[in-house]
Amino acid sequence: MTEQNKRHRAGFVNIIGNPNVGKSTLMNALVGEKLSIVTAKAQTTRHRIMGIVNGDDYQIVYSDTPGILKPNYRLQQSMMNFVDTAIGDADIILYVTDTVEKGDKNEEYIAKLKKIQCPVVLVINKIDISTQEQVLKLMKWWKEQLPEAIIFPASAQEKFNLDNIFDAIVGNLPVAPPWYDKDVFTDKNLRFFASEIVREKIFLNYKDEVPYSCEVEIEEFKEGAERYDISAVIYVMRDTQKGILIGKGGQSLKKVGTQARIEMEDFFQKKVFLRLFVKVDPDWRESKKELRRFGYEY
């Protein structure tokens, strides 16, 4: 091992917590790139997404995960498999809560954190919408629950206290060579981000069950000299959902396509020609075969 490798720190920092506490917003802020889609709806994140931050003597491999829930169907079970895997292979757990939720909501996972061998950094997010008294009370409560945890009040949205969180993470990384090349910033490819951008726009533009009944698959992804040609299929579970998604005269789907194309062009730094299609697949959330095709694990 070289002298530089003896000083180099690297490890997996896995982010877990309930839905809607700001895990994805926090990871995007820490990484400095929008890698995880963000909406106000719960269960927006379905996959485990890595964001990699490199320095001369460190590499942090952040991993955003779906919000903790009790699964009602096979898709949600796969989402929770991502969470359980993240707990098992972490060098540091970054547990995110906020000033709104009840601390004892996840007793099962809090019990796991008490037994875990790796460092736990606990972030109380959204302090910008709380009072100092409430934040201090929450910090005291969490310190009683997880005495070994390093606790930070923060606001991912306002980027408050992120420097201190970053310093604590780097200071607790194990000494190790980098896991990835230093010019890599995520483990996902552009096809994945194209599908996630479309799915985000669906979450932002529709309500009720429609966003949760949709999955996006990229059927064509071609890079030309001047633009990307992308064809995406949006799968829904019922014909009525297909009608809602398309909208009168196709206007609703056109809006989603326009918003997605604009964001893709910003993310890919190249022009995008995007085609959207809608198909009905009543069983995609329960079918192991379909879920594997969409990138979910079993």
Regions found by a protein language model. Give the residues of each.
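Conserved glycine(s) of the Walker
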Residues: G22, N161, S252
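Conserved G1/Walker A P-loop phosphate-binding module
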Residues: M1-N81, T85-I87
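Active-site glycine-centered loops adjacent to acidic/histidine catalytic or metal-binding residues
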Residues: D64, N125, S155
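P-loop NTP-binding site
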Residues: L190-Y298
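Conserved C-terminal guanine-recognition region of P-loop GTPase G domains, centered on the G4
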Residues: D57, N81-A149, K222-A225
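Canonical P-loop GTPase G-domain recognition
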Residues: P119, D128-T186
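Conserved, well-folded catalytic cores of nucleic-acid-processing
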Residues: E33, I52-D56, A86, A90-I93, ...
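Catalytic P-loop NTPase motifs of RecA-like helicase/translocase cores
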Residues: T45, I68-K70, K102-G103, S130-T131, ...
